[in-house]
Curated annotation (Swiss-Prot):
Main location: membrane
Full protein name: ATP synthase subunit a
InterPro entries for the chain: ATP_syn_F0_a_bact/chloroplast (IPR045082), ATP_synth_F0_asu (IPR000568), ATP_synth_F0_asu_AS (IPR023011), F0_ATP_A_sf (IPR035908)
Any single GO CC term annotated in Swiss-Prot or TrEMBL for this entry: plasma membrane-derived thylakoid membrane
SUPFAM superfamilies: F1F0 ATP synthase subunit A
Alphabetical UniProt keywords: ATP synthesis, CF(0), Hydrogen ion transport, Ion transport, Membrane, Thylakoid, Transmembrane, Transmembrane helix, Transport
Amino acid sequence: MNLSFSSPPLLAELEVGHHLYWHLGKFTVHGQVLIASWIAIALILTVVILGTRQLQREPAGLQNFVEYALEFVQSIARAQIGEKNFRPWVPYVGTLFLFIFVSNWMGNLFPWKLIPLPEGELASPTNDINTTAGLALLTSIMYFVAGISKRGLSYFKKYIEPTPILLPINVLEDFTKPLSLSFRLFGNILAEELVIAVLVLLVPLFIPVPVMVLFLFTGAIQALIFSTLSAAYIGEALEGHGGGDHRD
């Protein structure tokens, strides 16, 4: 009697760090990250446009969802930046939250395998360090914009207080705080997608589903943490080092 066994799945088939490179002049970019980012942005814009196309006094359907999302983002900005200063920063905080939230969920829900690429494969934009570092750099820029818009060039006096010796440390602190957020987001999302990929290879039926549900929850939490702390840094810049009363 002949017994034949199918070969076990090869974990070596999982590719990490394999990219589709686009050459734009003198620059080389990760093409699959841009494609995935465009998909995330398109999804967000589609929902927002459809939800606000015909506004009703009594919201329903997508309008209700969009208004709830707006109120949620406003509550984050108000709590971290303060009642007096939060409104101009709602678009930025909301954009951060929605982009990270949708990107994280896309990593678990979107059928990336259905979109073949010449090299590499599509995945969540936030599992690439370039995306998360770019978001951190953007938050750092907004941090300085907030401080300068509030107090002008006198904002930079805080870097030599209480003594000029602390100048390098104070400058480094303002860049490392959002940068630490980028590494946390990148590490969590990359680990989640690798775990799901391994489970799908080993047990491809129902066992990965509860894990995917858990990762949907943690993806939402990561978006909340990044946007909340970004708003907190902006609030700190508006009130100065030491926190002040920006949450009152």
